[in-house]
Amino acid sequence: MQCIAFHQFASSSSLPIWSSIDNRFTPKTSITSISKPKPKLKSKSNLKSRSRSSTCYPIQCTVVDNPSSTITNNSDRRSANYGPPIWSFDFVQSLPIQYKGESYTSRLNKLEKDVKRMLIGVENSLAQLELIDTIQRLGISYRFENEIISILKEKFTNNNNNPNPINYDLYATALQFRLLRQYGFEVPQEIFNNFKNHKTGEFKANISNDIMGALGLYEASFHGKKGESILEEARIFTTKCLKKYKLMSSSNNNNMTLISLLVNHALEMPLQWRITRSEAKWFIEEIYERKQDMNPTLLEFAKLDFNMLQSTYQEELKVLSRWWKDSKLGEKLPFVRDRLVECFLWQVGVRFEPQFSYFRIMDTKLYVLLTIIDDMHDIYGTLEELQLFTNALQRWDLKELDKLPDYMKTAFYFTYNFTNELAFDVLQEHGFVHIEYFKKLMVELCKHHLQEAKWFYSGYKPTLQEYVENGWLSVGGQVILMHAYFAFTNPVTKEALECLKDGHPNIVRHASIILRLADDLGTLSDELKRGDVPKSIQCYMHDTGASEDEAREHIKYLISESWKEMNNEDGNINSFFSNEFVQVKQNLGRASQMIYQYGDGHASQNNLSKERVLGLIITPIPM
């Protein structure tokens, strides 16, 4: 057996469960930083292979050559009956990489310069805000971040220093508020008091006649923080206005207007909760190219950027597809969801920019690992086996493998090798050995999975509070964000590391709660069929006697409250964490809601999930 490049560490001590779940989940009645030069971003040139030190080899797993040898006492085990993947190896490898090459790059660069001149050259204040909004919704704002921040900073400064600022109407006020909040400028919610009836304290009734103003206020309200009552009132008020407008529009039997499409889209999910790529595709195809004042340069740039990024994703997916086939994990662990493409789809939501290819590839492998751990606990492992697996991980000792069944040996080897691969990369880029941090989180993850397994086998029905306190840690958000921290942070600080390892800061907690609850909303019906520990919806029903519909509404409310808490954290200037890491945290919440918006988008392979993969990864937008 070849030796791994890292020494084994001492056993982890028992892990405290950090939690401060408040009564929303009960029924309603710096130390010295480790500074290294900023690492170069991994580019597409090292997708196919990455050289490693000759002393670093993965541990080889030779215990499983025949898939059938992994299965023992099969009659005692549950089965989810997951179907085979609809995206085969041959299909992925046959994808044509259409939008690559110097001619496309040259054209994109030319268009980018034109759009930059356009953005800087706009003199009218409202027109400039509208252009920024359009650029964002077209999915190309990441190319103009410096220019956008400079423009918004100037507007923010002028507003603060000018005793007589521009007297905007509701539409313009809401648009500026949303854009400034989005980029971290502290704009007070009280600016919307100008649109309230001073006698009643309520928003003026005639706002319902200004549908673009109401829509703008609705979108702005989702940038509210915990305790901002004006924005909460705005959300409730404008939701009623937009639903009324939607009802009136649907009764006209005419073709949907662009405003109607925007209203329906917003009511389905606000912009703040949407991932950039899916919003860009929808806005390009459904709205922008149908607008009478559409700018051809902007449209061509947005389409070309989308398609060139998609070609990058296809290259990455081919690399991952070869890795998955060579690993034989699908054959050795036949009970596990074989959903490589869906695991990759998460990454398009988390970090879509072209320079983050290596992160998307490694994070996809991490999602594969989390899927294996999840299915092993939820579906296949016996309680005794799961305890043995957690013990083996905690000791991090290959000698423990003799106690495990063959299928768990495979899972352990994959966990062991992947963790050490990540640690090797972190050592190269940061000069820091992080394996103890990552290992501790993996052990913690399995302990919380094990708790759910104990509930299932004992028939125990947890309260909603018990479930969420355990579930936001069993869903794996803390593991995902630990990986992201090292990918997007330089220098690494001990304060942040200790916070991530032991304290589970709010920046991790709230994103993980959204992931947990969105998962529950999307997967409940499938999990009821196969039998599983009660999820948040069932826990609330059991706690309160509520119907399933009422319980779902309560879980949606908890998601909304978690977003407010996340918005609070985004404005925390004393945070240990970089803006890049904060963006990943936000995008994890957004990706969660995309994947589970119409059901179990991670496993079910229904038509809506298939269309999402086709639209974001497979099929280019016609030029």
UniProtKB/Swiss-Prot annotation:
GO terms for biological process: diterpenoid biosynthetic process. (2E)-geranyl diphosphate binds at residues 337, 374, 378, 516, 519. Pathway: Secondary metabolite biosynthesis; terpenoid biosynthesis; Terpene metabolism; (4S)-limonene biosynthesis; (4S)-limonene from geranyl diphosphate: step 1/1. It comes from the Eukaryota. Binds 3 Mg(2+) or Mn(2+) ions per subunit. It is found in: Plastid, Chloroplast. Transmembrane segments: none annotated. This is (-)-limonene synthase TPS1, chloroplastic.
